[in-house]
């Protein structure tokens, strides 16, 4: 004769099953769980009966929310021992390792959400502060395209004005004017240059840039270098 083994029940426990298990444990104790499961008439495994008793039905268990003292102790012990829930549970009478683990996960999830909520406005605020600092520390010199264009335009106009003043004069006249001691400015070039610069919207960025816009080096030539150039060119003979 072949006996058909009945399939073990799984899933949530009913109130009737809880009462049966409590009565059986009171009679036979909470040690031999395979035997308890068999004599109780419950279609449950010994492991299932043990977990139900330890986590829910034991008379020494506490139910409900964790007290502030328990919460503080859990955080302190977790910092010391990590995820060793059974060891932590021994320091909290009436609380199971599974209950403590669930509390910790809920606590950490809530803490992470609060951290994200706090960081959201602060990050945007930090961004605004950073942008403000950038604006405060921007150099006075602006090197955008408009300024560079104006500076080049100024140089071009000055050179064009100089060229127009020099037109109509021979090289002999130019060299004589350069070599003449105590002579006035070369054919009015300085005057033309100053007039051109005064009428042009040259951007005065810095002293260096303003020197570059109307450089004196274009208008003053060392007499010794002039003589050397004249000798090489044949005009100083």
UniProtKB/Swiss-Prot annotation:
Pfam families: Myb_DNA-binding (PF00249). It is found in: Nucleus. CDD domains: SANT (cd00167). The keyword DNA repair does not apply. GO terms for biological process: regulation of DNA-templated transcription. Residues 5-57, 58-112 form the HTH myb-type domain. It comes from the Eukaryota. A motif (Bipartite nuclear localization signal 2) lies at residues 109-117. GO terms for molecular function: DNA-binding transcription factor activity; sequence-specific DNA binding. InterPro entries: EOBI/EOBII-like_plant, Homeodomain-like_sf, Myb_dom, SANT/Myb. Residues 33-57, 85-108 bind DNA. A motif (Bipartite nuclear localization signal 1) lies at residues 62-65. Gene3D superfamilies: Homeodomain-like (1.10.10.60). Keywords: DNA-binding, Nucleus, Repeat, Transcription, Transcription regulation. GO terms for cellular component: nucleus. PANTHER family: MYB TRANSCRIPTION FACTOR-RELATED-RELATED (PTHR45675), MYB-RELATED PROTEIN MYBAS1 (PTHR45675:SF2). Transcription factor. This is Myb-related protein MYBAS1. The lineage of its organism: Eukaryota, Viridiplantae, Streptophyta, Embryophyta, Tracheophyta. The gene is MYBAS1.
């Amino acid at each position: 004769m072949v006996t058909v083994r009945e399939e073990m029940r799984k899933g949530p426990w009913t109130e009737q099953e809880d009462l049966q298990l409590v009565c059986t444990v009171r009679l036979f104790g909470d040690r031999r769980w395979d035997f308890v499961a068999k004599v109780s008439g419950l279609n449950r495994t010994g492991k299932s009966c043990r977990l139900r008793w330890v986590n829910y039905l034991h008379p020494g268990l506490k139910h409900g929310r964790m007290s502030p003292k328990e919460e503080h102790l859990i955080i302190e012990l977790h910092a010391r021992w990590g995820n060793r829930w059974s060891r932590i549970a021994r320091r909290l009478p009436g609380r199971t390792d599974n209950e403590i683990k669930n509390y910790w996960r809920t606590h950490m999830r809530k803490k992470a959400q609060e951290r994200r909520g706090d960081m959201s406005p602060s990050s945007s605020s930090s961004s605004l502060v950073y942008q403000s600092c950038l604006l405060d520390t921007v150099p006075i010199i602006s090197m955008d395209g408009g300024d560079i264009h104006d500076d080049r335009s100024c140089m071009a106009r000055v050179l064009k004005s100089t060229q127009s003043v020099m037109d109509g004069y021979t090289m002999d006249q130019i060299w004589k004017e350069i070599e003449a001691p105590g002579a006035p400015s070369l054919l009015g070039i300085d005057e033309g240059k100053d007039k051109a610069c005064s009428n042009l919207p040259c951007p005065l960025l810095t002293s260096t840039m303003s020197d570059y816009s109307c450089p004196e080096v274009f208008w003053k030539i060392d007499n010794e270098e002039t003589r050397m150039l004249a000798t090489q060119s044949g005009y100083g003979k």
